[in-house]
Amino acid sequence: MQHEITEKHNVFEENGEVMCAGWARTPVFEYNSEQSKTSGKHSERDCYFISNTEVSLYLSVENLKIAVADLKRGGVIYDCVVKKFVFSKNELPESGSSGELLYTDKRLQLQLTNTPNGRFLKCDFIDFGGIKNLYFNINLKKTAGESLNEIAPFERDRKYFYLKRFVPKFVAGGIIRVGGMEYSLNETTTNAYFDWTRFSKPRKHNYQRLSSDCFIDGKRFSLCLASRVGDNRYGNENCFFTDGHLVKLSQINVKSTGGKLDRPWYFKAGYSAVDIIFKPFTVKGEAMAAYMDKTTVIFGRLYGELKRVDMDKPLVLDNSQAHIVLTEF
């Protein structure tokens, strides 16, 4: 049974254990890593995904992982700088209105700034992917809507935990330039989500997440279907959003491709409550994917239906933009 939490809770008790477990529509889980009592390290992962019908930009700032996919012409360019950030020194909280993260080396200059209204992202990357120079200058504006917030302790030792926020409530304006190709981002047609994760775990996990952030029949649609981390009986990451309203889903059955990234993935739950197929884009017979350190992002489309008893009719996914993130952490 999924447990919805509506009031604010500290993530850690006085003894460092995580006793609350569940999910929420707002960021009610108050996190302070200094209250943790685990012997292992705390990991921090922030990811942005910006997309319209022409281009998608993936940006992860745990290590610097950047991928730009051309959705009309086909093809993806990507690069990675293995440089872990300490977010306690460069805090970008989901609800904050200040804070800045800066990184500079011989090839890359990256700036991420919190603003009262959202985020400002700027990047100059020389010889991006060993092919072309990359430049982007993007303003993310926060819009109204709910977010998915999940806290999952680990059963055998509740001092270990997994805390997630999936925030699909930004629109983007600005430009992305890769070599001589320039993509314009307009707030009316370009969506962005923010994926925020904090955790301390006793072992490594192979993690997968299917996400979408597009328009269906003029309404914004966002999706998050993810594999299990920790004890998520009371709260998992599985959900979708229509025009900012969160619809929670329970366990999802996934039939993957056995490592063949160009093959379809199948996602099912309940009595056809979830029945969707993810089909990767292919270029010259290969999946359109970015390979960055221990993370792979596959770009593709969704087909199928989502059904709920409180919906007048099924939500039909037909050639809807989507992507799968595969990573080890």
Where are these regions (language model features)?
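Structured soluble/peripheral alpha/beta segments that form catalytic or ligand/cofactor-binding pockets
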Residues: 1-329
